[in-house]
Amino acid sequence: MNKKMLAAGSRDEYGETLKEKQEIEQTIINVLNDQGYIPVSTPLIEQENVFDQYQEKKVFHLLDHMGEKLVLRPDLTLPIARFLAANQTTLTVTRLYYLGDVFHQIVNLSGDYNQETQAGIEIIGEQSFEAEIEALETMLAFAQRFGIVDVQVVLSDARLIDLILEQFDLDDQIRNEMKQAIEEKNISRFEQLKAQIPDFPAELADWPLAFGENGESAMEKLQRIQAVKAIMDDWIRLAEYTHRHYPDVAVTVDLAAVLPQPYYTGTIIRGFVPSLGDYLFSGGRYDRLLSKADQETVPAMGMALKVETVLADRQRDLSSLSAQDPIVVVLAKGRVEQDVRPLLKKAGVDTSQLDNPARKLVFDTADNRYRFILVKANDVVKYLDQGIGDVGIVGSDTIAEQEQNHYDVLDLQTGKAEFVLAACKDFEPEKISRLRIATKYPKLASQYFHDQGEDVELIKLEGSVELGPITGLADAIIDITQTGRTLVENHLQIFDRVGLVATHFLVRKGALLQYPDELTTVIKRLVNLVAPKEEVKE
């Protein structure tokens, strides 16, 4: 029997679960209809150029019978912008709402789903800050209506990082690299760049970690910058509104936030549910996406609610939630775990359960603050990105070959090695029209040769890569070495040094909002421990 199977990343919806989802959707429709929002529906399939701002790897691409390039929509705001541009008469103050599915490419064999349902509002033509307040009120009212008890509001702004960096005399490359390091919470790179900036302000010394209480503390000191003060005044208005109308909802700020969507231009508002480790809603101001016939831009504010998050909250047993859920640390078994254990202990993490692991793979600390899971190196990122783990510790060689849906926070300076290009001593690449390169790391090798401007044939090996040149399978290899001894024993020599390898400290994106105090404390301690001695902070 030729059984028909689901495509990877997809799922069927059925029975009681689907009925619950339909009830949620109908409630949203009824509420927004009653509030006077106008429904709008756009096609699942759009012209490719509607999503020019999206990264290629995130979008499903299609071709029609004429060869026209199409995509499955990964977003619902951009199709609405396309609709409004085609119907110029609607570009007055207009309140629209939508309910539909969006599609995203996922990492192969990751276990993720590529389709989710969103309900959202778009407030078009409203320049005043009342649009932000209305959008926040709409989302918080839904959270209250659906009984989501632990939502917290996280405020950020698309302009903030650029406005602060403008205060320094930086060339474009340093400015762009600094912004990227801040948004990606890459503290190792941030520290390197910060050292190049004289008189860097103390209140931003830990800028990638400037969220939650750390962000609020830095926020107070940054109000001396007039443009920043205006942003923070708006945040205060939103916080005061929330506290007045929803006193049980916490409000915090993120001074290091990456843009949820590339078209945002101002205030960004997100609703995070710590116990689920996921966002309930997200949105912001986008004042340059729409324009009238005379090219005058049209202000707009939009917010999207994740229907699956509402459903997940409804289906769980709230009485089983524990305020003491441990932080889950996923460790690569073997040398990585052994080398990093003393460092974690010095940072205040109880690692005693790892001292005599026997055959166990899961360990809880006595105080229930941490849970350790030991896995193979290649599986660390999967556990992290699927929400099983909060922290991942693994070598950068493994990270380099996998998709990144987490923060690569810190180089722990353990497990040091390097990637090298090696071959037999008579290797003469200039005499070979197209090199054959054997490696366990095709992604890294491909990038290396791309940067060199060379076209090569890569051969993926799982075992002893050194055999490639010896047997004639390959002309050279890209592999890891610590001492170079294995290369020498196999009569190979190093022709180029490709990059460094070390153990890295990764954090799941939602974990920093779930456990802000504990994780930022540990991260800061680790920063001090791995810093050169003369740079160690008091």
Residue ranges of model-derived segments:
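Glycine-rich, N-terminal phosphate-binding loop and its surrounding beta-alpha-beta segment
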Residues: V50, E56-V102, I106, V380, ...
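Positively charged, Gly/Ser-enriched RNA/tRNA-binding surfaces
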Residues: T17-V31, E46-Q47, P79-T89, Y98-F146, ...
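TRNA-binding/sensing appendages of the translation machinery
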Residues: M1-T77
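Short, surface-exposed recognition loops or helix-turn segments adjacent to catalytic cores
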Residues: D150-L160, M178, T252-V258, I459-V465
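Flexible, glycine/proline-enriched loop segments at strand-loop-helix junctions
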Residues: E122-E130, I148-Q152, E177-M178, Q223-K229, ...
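Domain-level signature for soluble enzymes in the chorismate/prephenate branch of the shikimate pathway
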Residues: L321-E538
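Beta-rich nucleic-acid/ligand-interaction surfaces
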Residues: T42-V59, S156-E166, A257-G266, E466-T471
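Acidic, His- and aromatic-enriched active-site or binding-groove loops in soluble protein domains
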Residues: F60-M66, L170-R189
